[in-house]
Amino acid sequence: GSPVYFAAPNGALCALLDRVFYAASTHGGLFKGKPAAAVASCMRSGANSTIDRINKYFSFSEMPIVSSNYWNMLFDTQSQMGTDEKGNKTMQTLGYNMVAILQK
């Protein structure tokens, strides 16, 4: 997951994902078949483009992408942490769906 800055994941996360997924792809697809879910936390907007960018790493690595009942995003500021009821419900559903995939 990522906080959203300027409608994109932060640079440190992108650099990490670039290195990790490049290394995995050159060593026989280490992440192939492993389920994954992207999550974004933002104040107002930019979460969709952030989730899209993170999901591309999963797609290119042949990883099943686990979804929820809505976009995997939370709308909170640091001082309001945990107050986004719809976002919290979305995360709970995402957790249930991830468990269901992992138990198969």
Predicted regions and their residues:
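Glycine-rich phosphate/pyrophosphate-binding loop and the adjoining helix
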Residues: 59-104
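Helix-loop-strand module that forms the ligand-binding subsite of alpha/beta enzymes
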Residues: 1-64
